[in-house]
């Protein structure tokens, strides 16, 4: 009874078993709503599982590997590029440039695709460049905000310890905010999966799960569409979980001051 009250109490802290039970109940409710949904066009779980089995026999696994590797590559390149640009804002020369780049997140890729096509030397390079651009403009914005939000006291403490300005940058901004890099990465890495369908729809030569999804959607096979979407969701959750595990392993101190861990 105490746990039943606690889940609706503000700032309540539940133990791990209670959290697992709460999640299990909520998942069960979602599944029941799905099974007994009155919407005729909404595929039932059995239909989705059957469609997934058929897609798997047709090579969905290989397409998932292709898309996953492309997304990982795009995230890796985006992370390196965005961090270099964000860290460069410690120098006044680069601040207007990064501010301008961050505003590009408001643009649509429609129209810009033509220019990326002219610059790319292959279909894979075109897909990669589109994904890197889509993720980087958000990533660099988040990291620039993290750097701008570093308290003045941290800089003063480093200077009091007689550190040079480049040492201050290394200790306060690079090492001192490394845990927040994982948070920003976690938030923006999902952008790659959101853009994947469009990117793989533009370049179909290498296949990918986005190509399969577009084909199934074109023929209005809703059960197959749901099966692919749920598979992408599970892959995204695995990616998100992996980034969280990496953060906890490399930055175990990050959660010490948090009330909800």
Pin down the residues of each PLM region.
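Transmembrane alpha-helices
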Residues: 129, 133, 166-199, 231-234, ...
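Short cytoplasmic-facing helical segments at TM-TM junctions of multi-pass membrane proteins
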Residues: 142-181, 210-213
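Cytoplasmic-entry segments and transmembrane alpha-helices of multi-pass inner-membrane transporters
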Residues: 84-118, 141-145, 149, 156
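Hydrophobic alpha-helical transmembrane segments of polytopic membrane proteins
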Residues: 209-247
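Transmembrane alpha-helical segments of polytopic membrane transport and secretion proteins
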Residues: 1-24, 241-261
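Hydrophobic alpha-helical transmembrane segments of multipass integral membrane proteins
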Residues: 61, 65, 69-85, 89, ...
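Periplasmic/extracellular loop-to-transmembrane helix junction in inner-membrane transport proteins
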Residues: 7-13, 35-77
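Loop-to-helix entry region at the N-terminal start of transmembrane alpha-helices
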Residues: 21-22, 62-70, 118-139, 224-228
């Amino acid at each position: 009874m105490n746990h039943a009250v606690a889940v609706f109490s503000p700032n309540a802290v539940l133990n791990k078993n209670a959290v697992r039970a709460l999640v299990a109940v909520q998942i069960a409710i979602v599944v029941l709503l799905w099974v007994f949904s009155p919407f005729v066009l909404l595929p039932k779980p059995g239909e989705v599982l059957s469609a997934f089995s058929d897609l798997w026999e047709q090579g969905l696994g290989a397409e998932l590997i292709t898309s996953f590797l492309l997304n990982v590559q795009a995230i890796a390149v985006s992370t390196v590029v965005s961090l270099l640009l964000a860290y460069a804002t410690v120098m006044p020369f680069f601040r207007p440039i990064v501010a301008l780049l961050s505003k590009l997140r408001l643009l649509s890729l429609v129209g810009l695709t033509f220019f990326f096509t002219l610059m790319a030397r292959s279909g894979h390079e075109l897909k990669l460049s589109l994904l890197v651009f889509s993720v980087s403009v958000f990533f660099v914005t988040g990291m620039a905000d993290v750097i701008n939000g570093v308290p003045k006291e941290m800089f003063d403490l480093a200077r009091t310890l007689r550190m040079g300005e480049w040492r201050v940058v290394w200790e306060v901004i690079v090492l001192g905010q490394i845990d927040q890099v994982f948070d920003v990465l976690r938030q923006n890495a999902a952008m790659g999966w959101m853009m994947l369908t469009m990117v793989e729809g533009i370049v179909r030569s290498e296949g990918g799960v986005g190509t399969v999804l577009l084909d199934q959607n074109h023929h209005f096979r809703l059960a197959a569409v749901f099966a692919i979407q749920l598979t992408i969701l599970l892959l995204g959750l695995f990616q998100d979980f992996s980034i969280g595990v990496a953060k906890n392993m490399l930055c175990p101190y990050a959660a010490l001051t948090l009330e909800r861990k």
